[in-house]
C-alpha cells in the first residue's frame, strides 16, 4: 500500500509497465557480491551517496527531469532527488493528489533500492533466484486491488503463509524473464522487476529487491511498490519490507519462518 492519508489510487493517466532488457552491474567485492540493474545508473556502491543527490529523470524520457511536491498536510516540499525524497517520506510526507502519486514512480523504482544497496553484504551461501512460472506460488499476496476489506484479507492471507496464487486463483503468468515477471488476473495486469540482488537483511543468503506495479486492464487505476524478498528453505519468497512507504526492512528473523 502507498499511504494512509486517504490518497486515491486512480489517476487520469495510466501507468504503463513494460518489459525491458537491462544489463547488470556488480560491486568490486569478491564472491557473492551485490549486483544491480543498469537502469539504476550506478557504477559502484561507493557512488551511491552522490547518486542519491542527482536529480531524477523519467525512465522513458531520460532528458526530462522529474520533480514532485510532497505534503504532510500542513507544509509542502519540492523534491527532485532520492536523498530529499527519502528524507521527506520518512518524515511523513506523501503525494497530495493522484497526479503527484503517478509522478513518484521514478522515485519508487530507484530510491529505496539505492538506500538498501548502501548496506548490502556479499551473499555467504545459496544460489541466485530468477523468476519462473512457479513464482506466483512462491510469492505472498502483493499489490492487492480492492476495498479496505479486500486488502486486509490479503494481509491476513500473507500472515497465514498463503501464496499469491492461492489468494487469487485467477492470476496467471503472461510473461517471464530472468528479471521481469508479468501476470494478469482478468482485471489487472502486474509487473515485478528485480532491481538488485545481495544480502540486504544480514541473513547470509541472497535477497532480491523488486519494483512491482499493478495496472487496471480497463481503467486508469495503478499502484507501484517496492519489496525485498528472501527465499526460505520451504521454497517461498518471504517479504522483508514493510507494506507501505518508506518500505523499511523488517527486524530480521529466520528466513525459514
Regions found by a protein language model. Name each.
Residues 19-26:
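C-terminal segment of classical bacterial N-terminal signal peptides
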Residues 1-14:
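Bacterial N-terminal signal peptides that target proteins for export
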Residues 203:
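Acidic carboxylate motifs that coordinate Ca2+ or other divalent cations, activating on Asp/Glu
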Amino acid at each position: 500500500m502507498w499511504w494512509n492519508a486517504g490518497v486515491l489510487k486512480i489517476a487520469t493517466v495510466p501507468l504503463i509497465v513494460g518489459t525491458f532488457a537491462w544489463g547488470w552491474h556488480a560491486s568490486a567485492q569478491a564472491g557473492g557480491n551485490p549486483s544491480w540493474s543498469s537502469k539504476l545508473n550506478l557504477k559502484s556502491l561507493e557512488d551511491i551517496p552522490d547518486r542519491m543527490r542527482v536529480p531524477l529523470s523519467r525512465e522513458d524520457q531520460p532528458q526530462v527531469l522529474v520533480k514532485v511536491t510532497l505534503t504532510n498536510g500542513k507544509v509542502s516540499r519540492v523534491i527532485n532527488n532520492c536523498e530529499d525524497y527519502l528524507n521527506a517520506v520518512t518524515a511523513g510526507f506523501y503525494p497530495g493528489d493522484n497526479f503527484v502519486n503517478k509522478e513518484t514512480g521514478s522515485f519508487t523504482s530507484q530510491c529505496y533500492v539505492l538506500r538498501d544497496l548502501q548496506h548490502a553484504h556479499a551473499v555467504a551461501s545459496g544460489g541466485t533466484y530468477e523468476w519462473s512460472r512457479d513464482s506466483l506460488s512462491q510469492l505472498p499476496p502483493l499489490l492487492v486491488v480492492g476495498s479496505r476489506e479486500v486488502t486486509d484479507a490479503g494481509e491476513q492471507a500473507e500472515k497465514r503463509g498463503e501464496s499469491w496464487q492461492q489468494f487469487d486463483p485467477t492470476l496467471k503468468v503472461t510473461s517471464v524473464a530472468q528479471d521481469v515477471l508479468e501476470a494478469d488476473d482478468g482485471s489487472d495486469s502486474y509487473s515485478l522487476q528485480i532491481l538488485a540482488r545481495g544480502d540486504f537483511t544480514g541473513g547470509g543468503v541472497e535477497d532480491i529487491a523488486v519494483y512491482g506495479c499493478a495496472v487496471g486492464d480497463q481503467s486508469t487505476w495503478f499502484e507501484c511498490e517496492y519489496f525485498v524478498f528472501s527465499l526460505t528453505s520451504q521454497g517461498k519468497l518471504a517479504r522483508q519490507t514493510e507494506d507501505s512507504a518508506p518500505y523499511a526492512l523488517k527486524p530480521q528473523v529466520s528466513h525459514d519462518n
